[in-house]
């Protein structure tokens, strides 16, 4: 009796393995000519889309970041204005204060043609743009001269840092969703 149960269990297990679904077209063919042709068309369309996106950029939209091209926030905005269909969700911010600076991180859900990502961006007010090389100039000094209040200047600097972190996140999201990650200067020159 025990032998019969083992044989039945083995037969059931073999039937389950045989019914594992396979990727097929309507004719139950694993890889069809139509499937391959459609994949080739997608590659061609994506290449044309990327070329169109890159044509929208101005020279100052691309910065050299450790020897690699980096699309700035303005460049990402230009791409989004030409290539429609990007969906940008609500930014969530995490702010860390290490006196006298703010460190801002943001995450933004993004979508383009069915592909999704959570784009990450960050910014620090310790950057010389915000506080100058001496720690008391840059944007902070401009806000302080204009408002006369250190508290108000700090609040305005935090707003600037949040804006920059959001721009960085959107730039990274556009780059990732379009497949522009890992671009080289030689590819851009072509």
Model-derived segments and their meaning:
Residues 2-190:
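Polyanion-binding surfaces on beta-sheet-dominated domains and ring/shell assemblies
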